[in-house]
Amino acid sequence: MEVERLDYTDFLNEAPGRQEAFVQHLYAALSRVGFAKITNHPIPESVILQLFAWTKGFFTLPLEHKRKAAHPPQPNPHRGWSCIGQEKLSVIAQGKAVLDLKESFDMGPGDDELYPNIWTDEGDLPGFRAFMEDFYGRCQSLHLQLLSAIARSMQLPDSYFAPLCSQNSSELRLNHYPAVSRHDLTTGTMRISSHTDFGTITLLFQDSVGGLEVEDQTRPGHYMPVAADDCTDIIVNVGDCLQRWTNDRLRSANHRVTLPRGLTHGMVDDRYSIAYFGKPSRDVSVRTLSALLRANEEAKYREEMTAWQYNQSRLLQTY
């Protein structure tokens, strides 16, 4: 089974037949695997290439510069630079800590008064902040467009999910997986351990190194590689909040980053990826939505919990 690759120009096309085909293929991919690939989307190739260049530029800064933007030792605010091993996603998936071999940088919306962003000095990497704030905005626009496609695929108005995400709390994360020996990745150490994402949908940009795998939802415990064909492709995956809203019609899939398949010896190259974690407004409920219940179907997620409360409950396990 492979992750389906969809042409986004079909959704932007004025011909209703092409739009309908796109939304139905998107729903089929997300309901079957939890993942899809989007090509020919609105974010230009030149911007994505700059994105990877800025990401590499940040992670190659001297340690003392990155420490100026250090993530606090506690889970919140989920902002700034995290060193290797600071975040332990394996605690969520397995109930035990296994070192995740990555460093990361997290940011949210520029107008977030509750959790303001944490930046290194402008002089350390001039232009970095301005580029990332612009890129964040591009991702938020695409996030809402894709939610409109998902709404339409489920026979809801295109704008159905928009009010649930009106107070933006989404996060952009830059990831760097340092070069590591093949031996280290065959002895239980993951580049990033198996986990699901917390929010609505995630937009993932990855380089050509590979190693991303997604669990086959029809065969728990079996993982399949997500090919790193083109860094301009966007990998879209379902998050926990969308799973809860849809009463498991769309399910968040476990995924991890490990040894690229086919590599038999030597070193695994540095890997860079960027993830935009689309999220609901913090005060929005993550109970199952009544509009998404089929006839005679009971809601699986009935407890009253806001998106912020759910996000915090997950974050507390990772730091």
From Swiss-Prot:
Entry's cofactor comment = Binds 1 Fe(2+) ion per subunit.
What is its cofactor?
Fe(2+)
Q: Which residues bind Fe cation?
A: 195, 197, 255
UniProt protein name: Proline hydroxylase buaE
Q: Known EC number(s)?
A: 1.14.11.-
Biological process terms from the Gene Ontology for this record are:
antibiotic biosynthetic process; small molecule biosynthetic process
Q: What does this protein do?
A: Proline hydroxylase; part of the gene cluster that mediates the biosynthesis of burnettramic acids, an unusual class of bolaamphiphilic pyrrolizidinediones that display potent antibacterial, antifungal, and cytotoxic activities. The first step of the biosynthesis of burnettramic acids is the hydroxylation of proline by the proline hydroxylase buaE to generate 4-hydroxyproline. The PKS-NRPS buaA and trans-enoyl reductase buaC construct the highly reduced polyketide chain, and the condensation (C) domain of buaA then catalyzes the amide bond formation with the activated 4-hydroxyproline.
The pathway it acts in is: Mycotoxin biosynthesis
- Which top EC class is named for this enzyme in its record? oxidoreductase
Mind listing the UniProt keywords for this protein, alphabetically?
A: Antibiotic biosynthesis, Dioxygenase, Iron, Metal-binding, Oxidoreductase
Q: Does the keyword Metal-binding apply?
A: yes
Q: Which GO terms describe its molecular function?
A: dioxygenase activity; metal ion binding
Identify its protein family. Answer: Belongs to the iron/ascorbate-dependent oxidoreductase family.
What residue stretches are annotated with the Fe2OG dioxygenase domain?
Answer: 168-280
Which residues are 2-oxoglutarate-binding? 271
- Pfam families attached to this UniProt entry: 2OG-FeII_Oxy, DIOX_N
Taken from the UniProt record, the cysteine pairs bridged by disulfide bonds within this chain are none
Q: Which domain of life is it from?
A: Eukaryota
